[in-house]
A protein has these predicted regions:
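Arg/Lys-rich amphipathic alpha helix in sigma70-family domain 2
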Residues: 63-70, 80-101, 116
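Structural recognition of an alpha-helix C-terminal capping motif at a helix-to-coil junction
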Residues: 38, 52-59, 73-85
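Amphipathic, Lys/Arg- and hydrophobic-enriched alpha-helical face
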Residues: 29-47, 64, 80, 127, ...
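Internal acidic/polar
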Residues: 6-10, 89, 96-120
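C-terminal edge and immediately downstream basic/flexible tail or linker adjoining helix-turn-helix-like DNA-binding
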Residues: 2-7, 16, 99, 139, ...
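DNA-recognition helix of helix-turn-helix
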Residues: 88, 134, 143, 148-180
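Short, charged helix-capping/linker segments at alpha-helix termini
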Residues: 2-4, 18-27, 37-56, 180-181
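Sigma70-family region 2
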Residues: 18-19, 45, 56-73, 93-94
Length: 181
């Protein structure tokens, strides 16, 4: 995770995508692929499934961009909403089919450099020890750069709940990192 924070996604990009501008979709992909992938991974805990959900999210953004209503907020929140519902649908499909989703900590992208892989494994292993909602909140804030109020809106939780869970998660992560292996 070399790029920790991500700029707000411009609503203008979605307007251009709605008009069929493929260059705008490519620009959106460059800006949003990491936050989308990381959020999907925090839900699915399977790197291959997260990759699929990321691709499905971009297809859905392409199809749904004409229905997007600019609100003056970070458009990434809307896109991550699509990611959330796509990932949850994938989880339900897997459960109905009886297919176990493997831990993301067991998956390593072979294209990454060794150090990058090592960092991913450590990060995923530590994050896997958080509860699902805690992991989502941490990833959405730290990795995607969403503000707490945007996370509250996306996850349909109260802002004080998000803040409390975020602080508690950070304390839990700090304890996990300090514990001898």
């Amino acid at each position: 995770m070399s790029n920790i924070t991500h700029p707000a996604v411009s609503e203008q990009l979605l307007v251009r995508i709605a008009a069929g501008d493929k260059a705008a979709l490519a620009e959106l992909y460059a800006q949003a692929k990491n936050p989308i992938y990381c959020f999907a991974l925090s839900i699915l805990r399977d790197s291959f499934a997260a990759e699929d959900v990321m691709q499905e999210t971009f297809l859905q953004v392409w199809k749904s961009a004409p229905t997007y209503r600019p609100s003056g907020k970070n458009a990434l929140t809307w896109i991550l909403g699509i990611t959330k519902y796509t990932a949850l649908a994938r989880l339900r499909e897997g459960q109905r089919a009886g297919i176990p989703l493997e831990d993301a900590a067991d998956k390593v992208d072979p294209r990454d450099a060794f150090r990058d892989c090592e960092n991913r494994i450590v990060t995923q292993t530590i994050l896997a020890q958080l509860a699902q909602d805690e992991r989502e909140i941490v990833v959405l804030h730290v990795v995607t750069g969403l503000k707490h109020r945007e996370i509250a809106e996306l996850l349909e939780m109260l802002l004080p709940t998000i803040l409390s869970k975020y602080r508690r998660s950070l304390k839990k992560l700090e304890r996990l990192v300090r514990e001898p292996s």
